[in-house]
Amino acid sequence: KIVQALSSMPPAARAGKAAVCRLAFCNRDGGVHSGVLNFLPEMGMPMQHIDRIIRSKNVFTAQDGIDTARELAIAIAGDRIVAVGKPDDVIAAAPAATPVLDYGEQFVCPGFHDAHLHFFHTSVGSSPYMLMDMGTSEAALVQHALEFSQDLPDDAWVVTQGWRDYRWDPPEHPTKASLDAAFPDRPCVMYSGDGHTLWLNSRALEALGVTRDSEPPAGGSYDKDASGELTGIAHEAAAMQLLPRCLEWLGEGRIASAYADQMRRMAEQGITSICDMSLMPMPGCDFIRDDVYDKLQTAGRLGIRAHLFPTLLDDQSRLEELQVRYANNALLSAPGFKQFFDGVSSEHTAYLTEPYTNPRFPGDQGRLTVPAERVRKLVLAAAERGHTVRIHVIGDGAIHAALDIFEEAADLYGLPQHGHNTLEHLENLLPEDIDRLRKLNVVASSQPCHITLDPGGPERDLGLERSRIMWPFATYKQRGIRQAFGTDSPITAVTSMNVLYTAITRQDPKSHWPEGGWLPSERIDAATALRNYTLGSAYAAGDEQNLGSLEPGKYADLVVLDQNPLTIDPQELQATKVQATYLAGNLIYER
């Protein structure tokens, strides 16, 4: 791209810009070519200066159409890649004193990009202030929480995240009674593993002002027993509205420390970029803490490239203010909005076109957490102003309705000029909606580790027929649909090798269930999985011009692995270790 820009300039203009040096670069067809490359002053680098060259016999650039790793060298100046090509050519073209880091047979690829997570809860959940625990039963989890609480500050609420009652023995719904017995005087809040339900004790309900007469917000509910008394369970919007207040005691200092620690853990996983997604559909509750990111960057402690997606509201000023603030910020950006549309299948809140196979009441087909007409108006208003939207949709009914809205937006305003609309999770689809994704240029953003999160759950809730069209990664590839991969952390762990392992094998990263993979026809090869986790995620962030592949002009975000995922047995993937991680050309982790 830089060569093309130079070629279009008059000779005098080129000469006036800078002296040129000869470098090799790699074209999209995979061939290595030589060309003239100029270090332009606007890149902020001295003329003919390269900070370092990284070489390896196994470099996977993640470019479309190149599914192999090759022997290449990557020249880096500042935070950008300036050349990729044959090692001898790149080294010969660089100044003699340029450092060359030779990784031998180790595997080099773009830094991993988690396309969907919730960084506040991921960070706090890994801190000393929140217990991450699914528990094996209600009693066991309460006991763990009691032990955990002994080391908490005096002002702390007891907060846990991760419970999944359908995986307990016995699989019973919990109530506040067990929490009240353990914590009669201290607020205790347990946040479910799917992120859509809260389980609270009486002291927490009292502190939050929730009584049996309280009206839940639209799209939410409070469970009650036969006498009308609160059981301590809040669902969807009701849970989401309460959660921020349950965490106010943390304060900015503790949160910033948790963020910095989590960024270091991400670097250990080879993750250099994230899409931090709004967790709540209500104003002021989305947990997108731009103030914390700003504080860390000012202190020189921002160790990740973060794309922020706040909640879509009638007032779009928050996103637009962030876009102005981050216009020239290489590490922070706000590409678009996040919008909720339905819930989750395990709680029967994902919206289906037909009732659940195991209905909890007649006509049980889930529900839209935000009315369709409301979402339509919000998305169309965003499209009119040129903003992209990423919509949480799990059930086939919600997916179909969201595509209808994107189609109307395209008819009225055209496809987005910058970035891409994205559907998040999209677990079970109507067959006819798969091709609509390609037609509307919508990115399918999935979290591979969700596949085995609830063993037997799809068949239990949806039946065999609908379960055959779930997380169809291979079908997406065959139909030419752009995919992005993430974790939805803290719903599943931020473990990069687990993302790749589950996408390739469709087996659980812990139990390795089932043998041969769940819906094995939808397994994908390692090159596709890597591309989805790098270049595909950059598409979801609307930043594929700067991220996602190892090409001249893109940011120098790289990861070095001790094994080649393209050639090893997939069952060995989880033993693969990150050897080094580079962000913006700087080494931020080394094993």
Residue ranges and their predicted role:
Residues 7-8, 14:
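Low-acidity, Ser/Thr- and Arg-rich intrinsically disordered low-complexity segments
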Residues 299, 323-329, 438-439:
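Acidic (Asp/Glu)-rich catalytic clusters
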Residues 118, 331-349, 442-452:
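Non-cysteine beta-strand/loop elements that form the S-adenosyl-L-methionine
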Residues 49-56, 60-62, 66-320, 346-394, ...:
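Divalent metal-binding segments
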Residues 380-390, 397-421, 426, 431-435, ...:
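His/Asp/Glu-enriched, well-ordered alpha-helical/loop segment
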